[in-house]
Amino acid sequence: MKKTSLKDLPSVHQVLLEIKDDISLHNNYLKFIINKELDKIRGEIKEGEISKSPQELLVYIIDRVLIESAPQLVNIINGTGIVLHTGFGRAPFNGRALKGIADRLEGYVNLEFDLQTGKRGDRQDNIRDHLSALCGSESALVVNNNAAAVMLAINEIAQGGEVIVSRGQLVEIGGSFRIPDIIEKSGAILKDVGTTNRTHSKDYGNAISNKTKLILWVHTSNYVVRGFTRSVPLSELVALGKKHKIPVMVDWGSGALLDMNSLNLADEIPVKTIMENNPDLLTFSGDKLIGGPQSGLIIGKKKWVNTLQNNPLYRVLRCDKITIGLLEETLRSYRSDSFTKDNLSLSMLTTSRRILKNRGQRILDFQKRKKIKDLGIKLVESEVEAGSGSLPEDKIESMALSFKPKSMKITELAGGFRCGSIPVVGYTSGHTFYIDLKAVLPGQINRLAKAIDQV
């Protein structure tokens, strides 16, 4: 077949006539999408990447426009085994909880209105009470992520002055969040002390001057340094700060509201235990080990929390009613004896290998023998990580479905799963494709079985 030329391209009007009855979108928006796709295809034609007849080209364009005009944020099956997957929105939500929140958020809500007094309220009040009770703090504040929490606190307390941090705690997490960069953007000056592997109390003491505004203690939650190491206990830093009248702040990263050891997970010190050291402020994430929406949680002394809330940056970083509602629902789940069932992240992280094996067998039982043979499907033991830099040393037991297809490339199989009517994202290792069951929701097992059958 001869190569497609630019003359073979249909007009916007022609494509519009073909699809206007299939898509209930405004013509102006459809024209925008059609033009966007036509521009892409012009480039592909010039590169000689398309060989289609005019009619085939029209069908091809219509298919692309239909895909582009469909909702882009869709429900997927997470077959990576990573429960707190950043690319998939970190902590997953319980459908029942979402429905409850949706009902409460319909129409108007008392976000900043006190129903008892009939006067203006504070959107932070309810969250503040929940967090203070769970964390043992005087007060609390919520902003849109932990990076925002750290930046707001440093800007308010240390703008124009120095922030003392151990060199061993100058962390970087995904998305290029670096402590030195956050300090700089907050308007403060980094004063790093000690070395990468060893920092002593005297290093902090020698660095204190009349320029010092804050001592920052950062939890290296996404990596561990072993061997010839030393770090200063938080209690010593708090005492040092108190002696010199310098506030001490903790960036606790992932954060956990309970003892992970009790759930047979790695030892992650609960936030409440850290607060027993009496730091002035502590920040952590709401969408990692806590299992809530994207948010940055700030707890600590009432004096400092109130000061942060009066900073103009708070207005820029504050959360909306949807985040507040979801976070409240998440925190409320910790008051229940069945919190591991209500909190989807904790539920999946603690699901035993035995249960996952049973789910995997159900999926295999659904498949025809020929399908299992053609795709080379086996149920195998696996190990996964929590994700998002949480519990970095903990390898969590799991089960996975492995695929070694006879007549299909691994990349084709992976693409077929991703782009199917039920999107499934797994991972490839060597010449094998895997769908790990750790992060597959219980209600998705039948859908996953159908997705395998359809691939």
Where are the predicted features?
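Long amphipathic alpha-helical segments
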Residues: M1-E68
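Short Gly/Ser/Thr- and Asp/Glu-enriched loop/turn motifs at secondary-structure junctions
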Residues: L9-P10, I77-G81, I290-P293, I396, ...
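Glycine-rich phosphate-binding segment of PLP-dependent enzymes
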Residues: D39, G79-T80, R90-Q116
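Short, flexible active-site-proximal loops enriched in glycine and acidic residues
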Residues: E68-G79, Y108-G118, S139-A140
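A short linear hydrophobic-aromatic micro-motif
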Residues: Q72-L73, F284, I422-Y427
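Conserved PLP-enzyme active-site core in the AAT-like
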Residues: G118-Y334, A451
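Conserved PLP-dependent catalytic core of the aminotransferase class-I/II
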Residues: T323-I324, E328-G387
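Conserved C-terminal alpha-helix-loop-beta "cap" of PLP-dependent enzymes
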Residues: N358-L441
